Amino acid sequence: MVTGRLRNTKHFVTDPITFLSDSMAQHGNVFRFQLVNGSMVGVTHAHHIKYILQERMANFTRETQLYDILELFAGRGLATIADHNRWRRNRRLVQPAFHHKKISALSEIMVTEIDSMCDEWAEHARAGRTINIGEQMSHLTLRIVVRALFGLDPHGPEVTGFARAAQSVNAELGKFVRMPLIPLKFPTPSHRRFWRAVGEMDAIVYTVINELRDSDSDGLLSMLMNATEADTNSKLTDRELRDEVITMLFAGHETSSSALTSAMLLLQVHPEARQRLCDDVDDVLSDGRATMTDLPALPYSKQVLEEALRLKPPIWMGQRRADQDDEIGGYHIPAGTPVMFSYYHAHRNPECWDQPDTFDPDRFTPDAVAARDRNVYLPFGAGGHLCIGNTFAMMEMQLALSTIVRRFELTIQNPDLTPTSALTLNTKYPVIATLTERR
């Protein structure tokens, strides 16, 4: 038993995706696995994930080790709050900032920042310089979120500092999430890097909150500061604002940058899809830039992104704990059992998808979507905890991908689709590309 726990733990820590793939192949869609710090149930079917997140949401709580860890840096934002009543109260306060009309009004911010990045890329192309696509997408999506959220200049040192700190948190916390044997309060080199990064993020966010109190900014953060709950006349405290801002900044740029990087990498290794997308954007974008009004005429760019989100979901897994005895797919779940579910494996489950490992954007034509069980695709979660920023993210990504493909031909050096999993799913190796301007 001890040997098995050690073997499982080593495999899980070094490569959790392959570990879960092997477990799924051997045991099916629901299985228990033993690690040195305890046992856990794994779930790899979308219907079972929907059951956990929607049908039995009240029984499967966020009171898990994963959310305890996430709370250390993200606090109690919408993505991490365990108490359901508090989550509902904060969701009501935050929701108006993400109304469709508000998001649509932010499209010009997205277009401006995308154009600015592409102008920088044009200089790189003329000079023959390479770019790191992952880093470029991270900077772009953070700049967009900073302007939309804060209404501030996204090119200042605060943005660079936050991006650096967020990358450090993602890397160091990803290690700890997989195997939290040494408490974070112990000053190992990794833990010191984590706490230093959290301190940097806090300093930046609190400074901006204080500055915005005396400004006339109309960004989302100003809306959150002024949001009042009708029943209690209460507002978000500074700590609650900090937690929501950290959550939005981290989730709002890490996830979108991961998806955009994956989409461009997948297009590189599937030239027929890349050419089809080029043909689409060439027909629609005569001036080389996509705006919100162009998006309905660019369905294939959305299909490419949706398929990238299926194969490479940035938020690739989640955890819950059974408050009372339950049953998932005929498998008994005793009260107190931690459950880990994988969107990555659910999106590649052969019971739900034909040729699940094949990149095929035509899975997301209107006819294909209408013919498919809508419960098998969960790129933004499910149930009441569905990602509040999903409309923002899809608009941002479609604008960016369409404009990039219209303006540039990217040649990625040694494209490798191997994933690596920290808090978010990323490519294992840097995605380095040369640029050629398209006319």
Where are these regions (language model features)?
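Cytochrome P450 heme-thiolate monooxygenase catalytic core
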Residues: M1, T61-Y67, E71, R86-W87, ...
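N-terminal membrane-proximal hinge/A-helix region immediately C-terminal to the signal-anchor transmembrane segment
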Residues: M1-R76, I81-R89, S104, E108-S116, ...
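Cytochrome P450 I-helix active-site segment
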Residues: M1-V2, S107-V111, F162-S168, S217-M223, ...
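Conserved cytochrome P450 K-helix E-x-x-R motif and the immediately C-terminal K′/meander segment
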Residues: N8-G28, A203, T207, G288-G329
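Cytochrome P450 catalytic-core helices
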Residues: T255-D280, N390-R407
